[in-house]
């Protein structure tokens, strides 16, 4: 009876956590690749059986944890996104580890379901009988003695496929071993790349003193630029129109990438489209340029707390920042952006020297509930309002309703309420307090949001690996100032580049505003064109496969189709 129960639980573990294998087989079709696919599955099933019947208790426990955890992560990912988790997705999840509480709240039902399927595996591997007691298995007892070492075979097999196919080829492979193969390939690749290259110092010529008193960059979170009132009739109220003639709207812009960490990293180091992977390691940071230009550097992080860093920021980079500000954990999510607005207003009012301020706003990362007050519901119906705690990463959000159409309507309405509050309230506080006669403020966002309006399954809003829909890369791009000389240049820039700008153009524009020689900027291939130059027709592209290796090519996506890609 125990033997039968053990086999049933193992089958539940393997088959239940590997959804879509049949569809994957159909996709591969009758070709040599199907033989490789089947061979890996045979290896995986055999090694799972060996570890389940291994006589040594410590060996079973040692392998239970990685096998179950890898299964849980990959299966949860598939339940949430309706896609297999690949190597690039795995790396993105590691980069987004700080947002894990968001997932535990919003997708709690799917996580519980995945956990129950994986629990079957944990029980099956560790319950009796074992090889030394299961009479029919004494003939293979020699193999179970080496069960721990033999677990490496499917890991190496999947890793070899990943390595030879540029990080691809793991779709439909056993989730029990995929994650371990991802770790191996990532580690081997890092070892082969060797130590990181040294960063270059700032070599760009500067004209002298800082020409503008305060330069502020606001990198909002998860904002679709085409849903805002500045770009859409009857769009979401942002409060930006109150800036009147000081508002220079470049329309919808393309982000650097469709994921927060990639966009923020690329932005802070001023990468170009052609060499971004090298430049994130070798370029001087925006802080270095600002300090050389005579600016005091300030970073306001509205998302993390207690010194936790995000978006690939390192302790070395932090040392370039004169004032590093994170918010008190007692602030509720919907209180954070208004608090930042008041903090910024005070900074601008009391500054006694030139300052460069970079802000990562709280914004509207999912889940959207808890990021606006209960009395600020304009778009209805919404997801159920609930208290999410005081952390930057909210938890315990009510799960979606069963009906997909109703869920999607509520999902999007909650998002619209969130951006209405977090952008609108921010600028309602900041604009009256700003002296735009000596300040330039740039407002954009790290990526857009995909609401699957075309009926595609899943609730993945951004960070798609591979070809991505345009909505993931559509962000706003606005500049606020009333400095006459700058306003004249911006007016000309908007006339030339409305709905043509990219975030890649913002960094060199900031350097020009800081007083770096524009002729040097124009003549250097180390920078994209500024917003003051006429931008090329195919300028609005964003990355959805950012970190590439093993011969794989990055994936670029347009937010507007203007001919062949």
Can you annotate each of these PLM segments?
Residues 1-174:
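Transmembrane and membrane-interface helices of multi-pass
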Residues 178, 199-203, 384-441:
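A long, amphipathic alpha-helix that forms part
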Residues 231-236, 437-487:
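Histidine-centered active-site microenvironments of extracellular/periplasmic hydrolases
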Residues 154-396, 474, 502-535, 540, ...:
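Active-site-proximal alpha/beta segments of enzymes that process anionic O-linked groups
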Residues 277-284, 401, 409-420, 464-473, ...:
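A short beta-strand-to-alpha-helix junction
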Residues 216-217, 418-462, 510-514:
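Metal-dependent active-site segment of extracytoplasmic phospho-/sulfohydrolases and closely related
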Residues 546-565:
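C-terminal, low-complexity/hydrophilic appendages and adjacent surface loops
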């Amino acid at each position: 009876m125990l033997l039968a129960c053990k086999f049933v639980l193992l089958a539940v573990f393997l088959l239940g956590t590997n959804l879509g294998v049949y569809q994957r087989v159909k996709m591969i079709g009758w070709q040599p690749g199907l033989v490789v696919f089947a061979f890996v599955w045979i290896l995986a099933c055999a090694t799972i059986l060996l570890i389940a019947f291994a006589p040594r208790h410590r060996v079973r426990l040692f392998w239970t944890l990685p096998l179950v955890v890898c299964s849980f992560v990959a299966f949860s990912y598939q339940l949430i996104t309706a896609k297999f988790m690949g190597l690039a997705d795995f790396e993105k999840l590691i980069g987004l580890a700080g947002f894990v509480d968001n997932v535990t709240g919003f997708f709690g039902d799917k996580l519980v379901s995945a956990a129950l399927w994986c629990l079957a595996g944990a029980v099956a591997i560790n319950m009796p009988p074992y090889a030394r007691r299961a009479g029919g298995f004494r003939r293979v007892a020699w193999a179970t003695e080496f069960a721990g070492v033999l677990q490496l075979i499917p890991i190496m097999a999947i890793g070899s496929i990943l390595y030879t196919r540029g990080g691809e080829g793991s779709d439909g492979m056993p989730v029990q071993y995929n994650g371990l193969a991802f770790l191996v390939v990532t580690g081997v690749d890092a070892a082969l790349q060797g130590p990181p290259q040294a960063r270059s110092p700032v070599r760009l010529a500067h004209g002298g003193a800082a020409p503008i008193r305060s330069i502020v960059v606001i990198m909002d979170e998860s904002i679709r630029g085409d849903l805002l009132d500045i770009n859409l009739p009857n769009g979401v109220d942002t409060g930006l129109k109150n800036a009147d003639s000081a508002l220079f709207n470049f329309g919808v812009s393309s982000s650097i990438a469709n994921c927060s960490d990639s966009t923020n990293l690329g932005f802070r180091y001023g990468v170009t489209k052609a060499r971004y992977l090298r430049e994130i390691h070798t370029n001087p940071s925006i802080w270095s340029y600002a300090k050389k230009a005579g600016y005091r550097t300030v970073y306001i992080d509205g998302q993390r707390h207690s010194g936790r860093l995000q978006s690939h920021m390192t302790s070395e980079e932090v040392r370039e920042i004169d004032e590093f500000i994170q918010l008190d954990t007692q602030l509720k999510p919907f209180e954070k952006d208004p608090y930042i607005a008041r903090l910024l207003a005070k900074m601008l009012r009391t500054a006694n020297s030139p300052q460069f301020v970079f802000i990562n706003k709280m914004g509207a990362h999912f889940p959207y509930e808890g990021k606006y007050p209960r009395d600020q519901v304009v778009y209805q119906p919404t997801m159920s309002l609930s208290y999410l705690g005081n952390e930057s990463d909210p938890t315990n959000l009510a799960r979606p309703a069963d009906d997909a159409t109703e869920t999607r309507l509520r999902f999007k309405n909650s998002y619209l309420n969130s951006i209405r509050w977090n952008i609108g309230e921010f600028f309602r506080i900041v604009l009256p307090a700003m002296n735009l006669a000596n300040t330039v403020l740039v407002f954009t966002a790290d990526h857009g949001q995909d609401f699957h309006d075309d009926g595609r399954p899943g609730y993945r809003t951004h960070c798609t690996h591979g070809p991505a829909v345009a909505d993931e890369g559509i962000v706003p791009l606005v500049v606020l100032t009333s400095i006459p000389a700058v306003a004249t240049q911006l007016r000309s820039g908007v006339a030339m580049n409305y709905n043509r700008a990219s975030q890649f153009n913002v960094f060199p524009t900031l350097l020009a505003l800081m007083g770096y020689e524009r002729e040097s900027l124009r003549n250097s291939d180390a920078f994209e064109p500024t917003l003051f130059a006429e931008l090329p027709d195919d300028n609005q592209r964003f990355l959805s496969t950012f970190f590439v290796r093993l011969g794989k090519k990055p994936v670029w996506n347009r937010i507007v189709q203007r001919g062949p890609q």
